[in-house]
């Protein structure tokens, strides 16, 4: 299964739509905040093709999206958050505490605008970077394991 991971679109709706169209085999789209309005428009446009899971970011003032989502996808427990509540700009310590206490296999976060793919102590930590800058990510969950890939839209 391919999962598309997006974050920090910051009003760049075009980038959001291009990223979704660039990954036609993605079955699930995670949006990690700071662009809730664009996310809601993408859900409206693409929900007949893909499942959408979103969380709010620190810039998403008027949304009902949760700040944290934990669910099992393809037999892997995935935690999604924007990251500001876990102070990710100052390190991953708080995020790691949440991941371990919730027994997660994969942690998705944004906020820093910096792509990151890290495997530590049995947990994958993945930040797709800022979609406003053309960064996004995909995660492939296969029988062989988990592969996290940071990508660029190549539209700049």
What are these regions (language model features)?
Residues 48-51, 123:
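A short helix->loop->beta-strand "cap" motif at the edges of active sites that frequently abuts
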Residues 90-99:
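Charged helix-capping and loop-helix junction motifs
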Residues 10-14, 36-40, 59-64, 86-91, ...:
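Active-site environment of divalent metal-dependent phosphoester hydrolases
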Residues 44, 68-72, 115-117:
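Short secondary-structure boundary/capping segments
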Residues 5-7, 29-34, 53-58, 79-82, ...:
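Active-site neighborhood of phospho(di)ester-bond hydrolases with catalytic His/Asp-centered motifs
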Residues 2-3, 100-103, 120-156:
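Binuclear metal-dependent phosphoesterase catalytic core
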Residues 51-88:
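Helix-adjacent hinge/juxtasegments
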Residues 1-49, 60-62, 66-67, 141-144, ...:
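N-terminal active-site segment of His-dependent metallophosphoesterases
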């Amino acid at each position: 299964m391919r999962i598309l991971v997006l974050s920090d679109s910051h009003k760049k709706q075009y980038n959001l739509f291009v990223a979704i169209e660039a990954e036609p085999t993605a079955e699930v789209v995670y949006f990690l905040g700071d662009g809730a309005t664009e996310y809601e428009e993408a859900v409206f446009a693409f929900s007949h093709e893909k499942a959408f899971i979103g969380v709010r970011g620190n810039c998403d003032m008027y949304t009902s999206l949760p700040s944290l989502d934990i669910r099992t996808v393809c037999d892997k427990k995935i935690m999604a958050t924007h990251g500001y509540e876990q102070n990710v700009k100052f390190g991953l310590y708080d995020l790691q505490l949440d991941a371990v206490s919730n027994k997660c296999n994969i942690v998705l976060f944004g906020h820093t605008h910096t792509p990151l793919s890290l495997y530590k102590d049995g947990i994958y930590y993945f930040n797709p970077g800022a979609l406003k800058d053309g960064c996004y990510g995909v995660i492939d969950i296969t029988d062989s394991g988990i592969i996290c890939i940071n990508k660029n839209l190549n539209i700049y």
